[in-house]
Amino acid sequence: MNDIVSIINNDPRIELYVLTALRIINNMIKGSPNKKYDIKVYLDSSMSDDILGVASVYTNEIWLNENKMADLVLLNDVDYNLLSVVLIHEILHILGMIGMDGFGLVQGEEGIPQNVYIGKHGIEHYKSILSENGFDIANIHYLPIENNFGEGTHRTHLEEGLDGNNEIEKRYIDDVYYPVPTNEIMTGFINKYNYITPITLGILEDYGFKVDYDSIYVTSVGKRLIFI
């Protein structure tokens, strides 16, 4: 097999989550710029209720919240186990998303403008999803990155559209409104309704991965895809 990601797991309780996540990841990603990824996955019963999973990009390890094993969410309008969706999110972090790749495609507090992604394909597909959902893209030049919620979320996820008090925050860059898909899988929080969009694949392409935009697991529209 030519799968880009494989998972080492000795706990039969998470076998379903692993198989689901691998099916989706390896359907979307067809080539890696430098290596294959062998990832170890564990359950952790000590995680607080507001933490669903944690990934180490240094050791290629992922910990999932054992207390969330029975929970369900939707991904692309289809029911999935919550931890399957969390595992996909954490695998994407290990692949470099977002800003963990060393390519310098995220502008932080020191950038002008601040907290944006500047990679070609990520921006291109952000604009395409905006256009497909009826937004004007004439003056869109960046992809907003999360600017709230502190270490672990700040600047390592797509913009959620919320401020640090969980109030709606519309992003304006150079006085231009930048609508954001608040439940894209690489925002900072897994929601009841989640979507894998071409934005995620565009960023991976910027990182050198070969991706399949026609994958059945990628969508630009959704019944509950929300823009803020």
Which residues fall in each region the model found?
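Extracellular zinc-dependent metalloprotease catalytic-domain scaffold
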Residues: 1-88, 93-225
